[in-house]
Regions:
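Short beta-strand->loop structural element characteristic of the AMP-binding/adenylate-forming
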Residues: 69-71, 78, 82, 86-117, ...
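Conserved AMP-binding/adenylate-forming core of the ANL superfamily
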Residues: 30-61, 66-75, 100-105, 191-198
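Conserved adenylate-forming
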Residues: 60-62, 166-174, 179-221, 228, ...
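N-lobe entry segment of adenylate-forming
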Residues: 1-41, 45-60, 145, 167-170, ...
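Gly/Ser/Thr-rich phosphate-binding loop
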Residues: 157, 266, 278-380
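Conserved ATP-dependent adenylate/AMP-binding module captured primarily in the ANL superfamily
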Residues: 97-129, 202-219, 250-264, 321-323
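ANL superfamily adenylate-forming
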Residues: 124-175, 179, 183-189, 197-203, ...
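Conserved AMP-binding/adenylation subdomain of ANL enzymes
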Residues: 200-217, 224-302, 306-315, 351
Length: 380
């Protein structure tokens, strides 16, 4: 097990990346499943790629006080480009691409990005509608975008092809690392800014509270589109130096979780609710003898012999189906699960660690181009 990381005096997220590359450069930092194969990058390779991306982003005009907008599903390139933007002293705004188009378009316009990172035609359409044709865009996969080579478009692979040396690290602890946008309950724009210092403090507390080490395997099955993901997954990954693993796509995330066997899962109410519903569909109907066996095994009756038998006959196979058989740190980000689902996981032996959103959202003025989504009045 690696020794705890000693933070640099001027700590920032990319500074911690460089520290990990220096102390455990050959260790796996990131995995991504592509075309059915898990591909790995070491900490040293990650630091080199982030440095080259920083040079490329500087060439696109990104710098201190400016903003990269990430509008992608879970992708390793998003994590690397975020760190590259931080390297330059810029901040990253992350939005969930699954939001309704009307709400998403307004948030994109409100973010006023210098550069936008997108993944496919749907994101391209909503970005162009919100920002116009001249807005600089980075495409994760140019093969999916015939127009990626336009005057305002760059492919991710193009950014890595340059030979420019990495610029000097410009990030400082007090700078904003991530900024999040949302529409409030009454239709007003709200923002939340997280500095490098805050994220490293929160991430350090998470590492200590859960005893996280470089031996963890974490699954990043959601985009970094929430403050909870940045606080409880992104920052701890850099600080503890464990491996961050990305599924091939959202459709394969459950199968990829079973293959990977993560020790750390940072999921939301929707994540764990989906898993509970999936297993419920596989169980025998109530009243069937096999269902009675399942219920008995989950009850923990029969003393130590009964609990051991129930584990091997029922709980272990169910945990294997869920891909949680090796999970020591199941984190629940945001709102809690319904009581029945929380109790069901507890009976399986999965003790969810609830981490609610305690950060404060602040009202902000939306630019004229940021159309608010329609919101009904309280009395409607």
């Amino acid at each position: 097990m690696a020794k705890p990381l000693t933070l640099p005096s001027a700590a920032s997220l990319p500074a911690v990346l460089l520290e990990q590359a220096a102390r455990q450069g050959r260790r796996v930092a990131l995995r991504h499943k592509r075309l059915g194969v898990w591909r790995e990058r070491s900490w040293a390779e990650l630091a080199d790629e982030v440095g080259r991306l920083a040079a490329a982003l500087a060439g696109l005009g990104l710098g201190p006080g400016q903003r990269l907008l990430a509008l992608t599903p879970p992708r390793p390139q998003t994590a690397l480009l975020s760190l590259a933007a931080h390297w330059l002293g810029a901040e990253v705004a992350a939005l969930d691409p699954a939001l309704p188009a009307e709400a998403l378009s307004g948030l994109i316009a409100a973010a006023q990005p210098t550069v936008t990172l997108i993944d496919g035609p749907a994101q391209r359409a909503v970005t162009l509608a919100a920002l116009g044709e001249a807005a600089p865009v980075i495409y994760l996969d140019a093969r999916r975008e015939p127009q990626a080579g336009g005057p305002a478009g760059r492919a991710y692979a193009e950014l890595l092809a340059g030979q420019a040396l990495p610029p000097a690290l410009a990030a400082t602890p007090e700078q904003t690392a991530f900024r999040f946008f949302r529409w409030g309950e009454h239709g007003g724009l709200e923002t939340q800014a997280l500095s490098h210092a805050f994220l490293l403090q929160e991430g350090g507390e998470r590492v200590r509270a859960h005893g996280l080490s470089a031996d963890e395997r974490a699954l990043a099955a959601r985009a970094f589109a929430t403050a909870e993901q940045a606080r409880h997954l992104f920052a701890p990954w850099l600080l503890a130096g464990f491996s961050l693993n990305f599924p091939e796509n959202l459709a394969t995330r459950d199968q990829d979780r079973r293959e990977l066997g993560p020790t750390l899962v940072a999921g939301t109410r929707e994540t764990y609710g989906r898993l509970a519903d999936d297993v419920a569909r596989r169980l025998p109907p109530p009243g069937h003898w096999q269902r009675r066996l399942v219920d008995w095994a989950l009850s923990g009756q029969g003393g130590a012999p009964g609990r051991a038998l129930g584990y091997w006959l029922v709980r272990r196979p169910l945990l294997d189906v869920l891909g949680l058989i090796h999970t020591r740190h199941p984190l629940l980000l945001g709102p809690p699960l319904p009581a029945a689902q929380a109790e069901w996981f507890a009976r399986l032996g999965v003790r969810l660690h609830a981490l609610p959103d305690v950060a404060r959202w602040q009202e902000a003025s939306a630019p004229a181009t940021a159309a608010r989504p329609f919101v009904t009045s309280a009395g409607a």
